[in-house]
Curated annotation (Swiss-Prot):
N-terminal signal peptide: none
Assembly notes: The PsaA/B heterodimer binds the P700 chlorophyll special pair and subsequent electron acceptors. PSI consists of a core antenna complex that captures photons, and an electron transfer chain that converts photonic excitation into a charge separation. The cyanobacterial PSI reaction center is composed of one copy each of PsaA,B,C,D,E,F,I,J,K,L,M and X, and forms trimeric complexes.
Pfam families: PsaA_PsaB
UniProt-annotated binding residues for chlorophyll a': 676
SUPFAM superfamilies with a match to the protein in the record: Photosystem I subunits PsaA/PsaB (SSF81558)
Organism of origin: Synechocystis sp. (strain ATCC 27184 / PCC 6803 / Kazusa)
Catalytic activity: reduced [plastocyanin] + hnu + oxidized [2Fe-2S]-[ferredoxin] = oxidized [plastocyanin] + reduced [2Fe-2S]-[ferredoxin]
Spans traversing the lipid bilayer: 72-95, 158-181, 197-221, 293-311, 348-371, 387-413, 435-457, 532-550, 590-611, 665-687, 725-745
Gene: psaA
Name this protein carries in UniProt: Photosystem I P700 chlorophyll a apoprotein A1
Cystine pairings recorded for this chain: none
Main function: PsaA and PsaB bind P700, the primary electron donor of photosystem I (PSI), as well as the electron acceptors A0, A1 and FX. PSI is a plastocyanin/cytochrome c6-ferredoxin oxidoreductase, converting photonic excitation into a charge separation, which transfers an electron from the donor P700 chlorophyll pair to the spectroscopically characterized acceptors A0, A1, FX, FA and FB in turn. Oxidized P700 is reduced on the lumenal side of the thylakoid membrane by plastocyanin or cytochrome c6.
Subcellular locations according to the entry: Cellular thylakoid membrane
Entry GO CC: photosystem I; plasma membrane; plasma membrane-derived thylakoid membrane
InterPro entries: PSI_PsaA, PSI_PsaA/B, PSI_PsaA/B_CS, PSI_PsaA/B_sf
Amino acid sequence: MTISPPEREAKAKVSVDNNPVPTSFEKWGKPGHFDRTLARGPKTTTWIWNLHANAHDFDSQTSDLEDVSRKIFSAHFGHLAVVFVWLSGMYFHGAKFSNYEGWLADPTHIKPSAQVVWPIVGQGILNGDVGGGFHGIQITSGLFYLWRASGFTDSYQLYCTAIGGLVMAALMLFAGWFHYHVKAPKLEWFQNVESMMNHHLAGLLGLGSLGWAGHQIHVSMPINKLLDAGVAPKDIPLPHEFILEPSKMAELYPSFAQGLTPFFTLNWGVYSDFLTFKGGLNPVTGGLWLSDTAHHHLAIAVLFIIAGHMYRTNWGIGHSMKEILEAHKGPFTGEGHKGLYEILTTSWHAQLAINLALLGSLTIIVAQHMYAMPPYPYQAIDYATQLSLFTHHMWIGGFLIVGAGAHGAIFMVRDYDPAKNVNNLLDRMLRHRDAIISHLNWVCIFLGFHSFGLYIHNDTMRALGRPQDMFSDTAIQLQPIFAQWVQHLHTLAPGATAPNALATASYAFGGETIAVAGKVAMMPITLGTADFMVHHIHAFTIHVTALILLKGVLYARSSRLVPDKANLGFRFPCDGPGRGGTCQVSGWDHVFLGLFWMYNSLSIVIFHFSWKMQSDVWGTVSPDGSVTHVTLGNFAQSAITINGWLRDFLWAQAANVINSYGSALSAYGIMFLAGHFVFAFSLMFLFSGRGYWQELIESIVWAHNKLNVAPAIQPRALSIIQGRAVGVAHYLLGGIVTTWAFFLARSLSIG
């Protein structure tokens, strides 16, 4: 950290342009107003595709970085408005159409529902009996559990929150308009990274966490403590009563009687009745202890508020981001991070790529924590919700990581300047990209052949009736010894590395079985040969996804095959006529291929999770403590062959969706069929060339001309890239809908 003389650096200040862009509904009402060519209107059907492709591609509309920055900033507010409207709708459904109050009174016997279908032509069958005399569609978003943890005790509070969401949405829409049309920040404001870091760290993350910790302590915890003790929701004081009448809090948490005295006398241990370090799960609800999560958010708040004072703005003290980056040199890394500051303040694609990679990874980590450490009350015994939350967060994370590859490649094509990056880390990566990609390719081949080979071996041995020669827990063992060691370490943590904790962070590592209402909430997950094998399939598919995305970024500007890629742009079908064998080399095509492998990777991950949990975790607990799992522990012996995966997982568990006709789950049956249809439809776009369709169209146009009904707008076949885009979109949509129907019909049947 350096203390700088005040005259050396420009002062950070808020600088705006007043009324830079007029508000014109007349202009906005004209399709394609953002692009001179598109604004002329359609001559061919390609126009509508280009309209969609370029509407949000601000780089194609202007080369002025300041204007692009303002458009992105304004779009962020628009996005937040959409999020608030969406959230408001969720809360409104909870208030108006749900059985939340009934569920709250009996959460272990009544299932959550927030949608009742109108019986127009017999759809009333979808309204299943969820208990307590309520008929509706069972929901698996986990919102009821979140609401209970937040301290909602009746539908009126949900209504109020829904209205609050709409107010916030209106505010965001206004802000988006205001900061583009009335007071638009100058470029230097967007590039003032130190102020941004301080604001985001201390303000958004620090004070945001502090506010949430405050809500948890003053509202959530007292209400949940009373609910856990069996007090009826209508008899629980309202949230503001706990805040205005400290005596009500002191009855539940005695330290409240002492007020702030222990805080200012540094006698903080007094507060350990509501800021705890227990570990494990609350045995009543199967969720994390709210006093642990409040403590966690308070600690996070302290850390981030401190972190938000690290960067130098107008007071001559603190870090400069540019200095940190330029000082970051290793013995073998040349100029190190020199030049990266300029990249990250002038290329929003580079910035976005890094943020997407980090946020995508974080989202996947969230997926793992949602079941290992279920944060909300009663969430852990709703198996359909647990499966839905895991799948949802895995897929979202996957899309974000592919997005990182996409924007990394766009940065390389549009924003990278080789002359400004000489011998820094980025330049050095690009210069030894062949070594990186060829090694990664070798790793993929090694993992692919070996992991798949283990399955092929097992299928063959089982077919030949030689179980003693198979890789399994009962024959040739391949135990995941490192994973077991990590589990053991975490199980021993209470009393060793975390001496004040009462239980391990997650019972997935080891410890006891937590049962709520006779169902397993969480228990130790034993790992064996079957897990070892499928984990190497995960390693294989993840490395292939990384290979495709990384190759797309590193070869986005040039390759031996197409040296002038940078001139061709981010997306192009082939290197022009007369150069065969140069298709699918653009940055866009790598994203296109990366999406398939991302989907491939995550399908195996969610299948593994679904079967493993049903086999070895989820189930019923009898009074003597013995556990009966949903699929009776068949994972260890069935998941070691390909045939086992096909027969005992896909086929056996598809019974619920295939046989759903005539039941409340029948919507999943039709979605299962529709998903397969959409998937098959995608292959029509992926497996046929543009010429086929152009020929067909010209024949159809000829017929129209014969009948004098020729269209004014000339029909054109989709371009090669457009066809691929439509293909991959339907491939993923069809696959996701099929998996959704398969998982939900299955998990709602066992729930």
